[in-house]
């Protein structure tokens, strides 16, 4: 069976990354593509399901996992830990399923060091003006918060060249097509096709 591919997807807040991933999943069978489920020490929010939205663990459990190098990457955010389990990712990839990991550039660097065969995709907004409009469109943040988010977005975007693929989300449908095209091209790579069609190739080349 062909090994699945791990896709690292990064973007500044407001670039449409989460919407694109969710739209992609709706077009892909579950046995082809999944989103990585992270471990976290924060409390579940209403409606969140253990193992579906996150794997909820306590601080001691998380630190024990860190001590045995169980995470591909982990970070502390607002006094809570978040991490991507190496074992969970590898188990899914071994079944031939592609896994999408929604993560920032720092986490992406950690992942690439431990899984150099992962493919990485960066999503850009079409302009700063449009990014500002999208950030303001939420209608919940002060000018100070918006300015901080914009500064964080610029810092995130400065790492775009570290990625394998670049998508500009100007038109959503076009960006989604670009994302699908990347997945299709990766599935047609020689290494994956040789595994997938090993029996056929053997028969075709037999005397």
Curated annotation (Swiss-Prot):
Its EC number is 2.7.4.8. PROSITE patterns: GUANYLATE_KINASE_1, GUANYLATE_KINASE_2. SMART domains: GuKc. It is found in: Cytoplasm. GO terms for cellular component: cytosol. Keywords: ATP-binding, Cytoplasm, Kinase, Nucleotide-binding, Transferase. The keyword ATP-binding applies. It catalyses: GMP + ATP = GDP + ADP. The keyword Kinase applies. Pfam families: Guanylate_kin. HAMAP family: Guanylate_kinase (MF_00328). Essential for recycling GMP and indirectly, cGMP. Belongs to the guanylate kinase family. This is Guanylate kinase. It comes from Shigella dysenteriae serotype 1 (strain Sd197). The lineage of its organism: Bacteria, Pseudomonadati, Pseudomonadota, Gammaproteobacteria, Enterobacterales.
């Amino acid at each position: 069976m062909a090994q699945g591919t791990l896709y690292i997807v990064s973007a500044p807040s407001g670039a449409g990354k989460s919407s694109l991933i969710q739209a992609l999943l709706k077009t892909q069978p579950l046995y082809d593509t999944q989103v990585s489920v992270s471990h976290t020490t924060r409390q579940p929010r209403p409606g969140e399901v253990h193992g579906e939205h996150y794997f909820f663990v306590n601080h001691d459990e998380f630190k024990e996992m860190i001590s045995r190098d169980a995470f591909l990457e982990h970070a502390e955010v607002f006094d809570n830990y978040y991490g991507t389990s190496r074992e969970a990712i590898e188990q899914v990839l071994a079944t031939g399923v592609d896994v999408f990991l929604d993560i920032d550039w720092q986490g992406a660097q950690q992942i690439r060091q431990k899984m150099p065969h992962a493919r990485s995709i960066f999503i850009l907004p079409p302009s700063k003006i449009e990014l500002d409009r999208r950030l303001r469109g939420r209608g919940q943040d002060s000018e100070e918060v918006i300015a901080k988010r914009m500064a964080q977005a610029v810092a995130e975007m400065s790492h775009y060249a570290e990625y394998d693929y670049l998508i500009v989300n100007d038109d959503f449908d076009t960006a989604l097509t670009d994302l699908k095209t990347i997945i299709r091209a990766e599935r047609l790579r020689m290494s994956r096709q040789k595994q997938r069609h090993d029996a056929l190739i053997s028969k075709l080349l037999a005397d």
